[in-house]
């Protein structure tokens, strides 16, 4: 569960390292974002000489959360960190690589490009 003011790691090579969530999209009164939800975030930490700079406002998709998500089969999937992938206006990732595992629920949310770039899909 990601809420406003939550910090997330960046799971791609776009140049940002840490994000802070400032708004959850796709709902007017939603307080928490889960895996597959789109958020608006501000870059708190970035690598120098990259395309994304510190204090830039970006859109991102949550790909991992420490709070477990329950599947239809009864299995609960839980990750070690909160992580997101930065996307552009079309919904495609701005980076060319995705680091770490991602959940299968991203495919249902039509983020197939992120799923195809990920090394492991759980």
UniProtKB/Swiss-Prot annotation:
Family annotation (PROSITE patterns): RIBOSOMAL_L14 (PS00049)
A GO term for molecular function: large ribosomal subunit rRNA binding
Keyword Ribonucleoprotein listed: yes
Keywords attached to this entry: Chloroplast, Plastid, Ribonucleoprotein, Ribosomal protein, RNA-binding, rRNA-binding
Transmembrane intervals: none
Top-rank lineage group of the source organism: Eukaryota
Pfam families hit by this protein: Ribosomal_L14
One term under GO cellular component: cytosolic large ribosomal subunit
GO biological process: translation
SMART domains: Ribosomal_L14
Subunit structure: Part of the 50S ribosomal subunit.
Cross-referenced PANTHER family: 50S/60S RIBOSOMAL PROTEIN L14/L23, LARGE RIBOSOMAL SUBUNIT PROTEIN UL14M
Family under the similarity heading: Belongs to the universal ribosomal protein uL14 family.
Designated name of the protein: Large ribosomal subunit protein uL14c
């Amino acid at each position: 569960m990601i809420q406003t003011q939550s910090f997330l790691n960046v799971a791609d090579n776009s140049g940002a390292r840490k994000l802070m969530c400032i708004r959850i999209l796709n709902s007017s009164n939603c307080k928490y974002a889960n895996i597959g939800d789109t958020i608006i975030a501000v870059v708190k930490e970035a690598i120098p000489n990259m395309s994304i700079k510190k204090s830039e406002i970006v859109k991102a998709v949550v790909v991992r959360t420490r709070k477990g998500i329950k599947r239809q089969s009864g299995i609960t999937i839980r990750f070690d960190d909160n992580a997101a992938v930065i996307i552009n206006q079309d919904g495609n990732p701005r980076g060319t690589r995705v680091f770490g595992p991602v959940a299968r629920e991203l495919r249902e949310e039509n983020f197939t490009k992120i799923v195809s770039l990920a090394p492991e899909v759980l």
